[in-house]
């Protein structure tokens, strides 16, 4: 414990005083845990849990004594019997089972007349629902028959459960809401504390994710342990991964001494005090520019592409996973001692990188997520995240919710249920739901069978019109949703009318969003022929055969591959150039050699002036002789 802080504690708190692993004794002793009810009103909690547990155990013992009584009477249904056989038969009835379930849930016991009336009412509602939804598929009907054959009492049990749940919703809602009193019930990621060093309308907040299941029940005890001498070497792990970027660190709970450090532009003194025992960052090219998302996600969504860029991204994804797991293996001695392991991963595949190894287990309670948003994984971002986690925050005291919201919540839900019961769905709306479901699943044979069975044509108007005003027909809906295969089948096989327009005057062709759907319309036009309809009114482009569409797609793919290859070449050249510059910078400019005279020049310099003149005359004479020989 920092004794200097304890002696200098004043009424105003500074950011540096709020580090949860280095709190002053005065501040630590002043923290008072706050508890709230369901309306976010502060409640003073009294320690009566032991008395309540003793009372509950006594009630259980009394209940057991009643059950094991030799009197021929049902203590649940409040009925007496003349013989033991009658009593045994009663225990096997649905009436007794209903009252047992209601008794366990704290509801009133029903009489025989009330039970018969409720069951009859529920049977009536069920039969009406079945009649209104009569357009049931044959497979669903067979499944329901098989279920009833397997368990003849299943339907009655479902009725009883429905009745009990309705009664619980009506009678137990307000009680459940008012009884939810806890320091965890803050409707936020924080736990709140009061302190005499704060203003009346202020509280100190700490993230719940810093606690495990045991310490969360007693946060004051956990804070005391964190600040004691028993916990001097505590560490935590921080990992972030996303977009091909990775950053990881092992952080000590003991801060560095930054007294006298200079202020940096991108890093505060508090961030400079973060003590990273180990840290590692690296990046690999795994996401396509301006597209986002990993290559594996794109493969799952649109199929596996065969371009050079996609192959490079797949390789880098695998390499990134190997690199991260290598870091985890190297840091295994640290990870085994960590109190917390915070991981930020954008998707399930990134999260599996950390758990698909022998270092970390998926069920490890130390593994947690950051309870706030983070930026690109870097060392500086890890420091910011640790500062956000490890410092108490001075926040305004939570405002209680309006009482009317809680009181009227059940009334509003009941009114909505009543409105839904009164507003019975039309047959056309039920048929529309089935058609939309088959379209989404791509079940063309079942869709054709459904239309024939219900005597519907391909131009069936989807209901309600307010919901499907922009997509009034199946063809409009398939075009807007990008269902290329279903659009082709609707035109070629079901013979939907492509000239129908929505309320904005747009045909199904006008709603398409990609080339695949456009090509499906053009293939259908080619298959149906020009005599099928007035194609000018449909706005569909020129007819194309499947071979022509395949040729267009191949050209498009070749252009994309060429662009990707050029991009990769440019990146490789840039990397080589960068590497060459780095080597040149490392080697330095070097020393230039002075001009060295030739051997002939060295020989001339060694002669005297007379010898040099004589040599020059001889050379000129030889040259003249050579010229004369060539001339004659």
From Swiss-Prot:
Keywords: ANK repeat, Coiled coil, Cytoplasm, Endonuclease, Endoplasmic reticulum, Hydrolase, Membrane, Metal-binding, Mitochondrion, Nuclease, Repeat, Zinc, Zinc-finger. Present with 3930 molecules/cell in log phase SD medium. It comes from the Eukaryota. GO terms for cellular component: Cdc48p-Npl4p-Vms1p AAA ATPase complex; cytoplasm; cytosol; endoplasmic reticulum membrane; mitochondrion. A zinc finger (C2H2-type) spans 72-96. It is found in: Cytoplasm; Mitochondrion; Endoplasmic reticulum membrane. It comes from Saccharomyces cerevisiae (strain ATCC 204508 / S288c). Residues 123-155, 578-632 are annotated as: Disordered. The VLRF1 domain mediates binding to the 60S ribosomal subunit. GO terms for biological process: ERAD pathway; mitochondria-associated ubiquitin-dependent protein catabolic process; nuclear protein quality control by the ubiquitin-proteasome system; protein quality control for misfolded or incompletely synthesized proteins; rescue of stalled ribosome. Residues 544-582, 608-632 form a coiled coil. Residues 595-608 have a biased composition (Polar residues). Gene3D superfamilies: Ankyrin repeat-containing domain. It is a peripheral membrane protein. Belongs to the ANKZF1/VMS1 family. The active site is at 295. The gene is VMS1. Residues 232-392 form the VLRF1 domain. Pfam families: bVLRF1. Changing residue 292 to A: Abolished ability to release incompletely synthesized polypeptides from 60S ribosomal subunit. One of its GO terms (molecular function) is RNA endonuclease activity. Its EC number is 3.1.-.-. This is tRNA endonuclease VMS1.
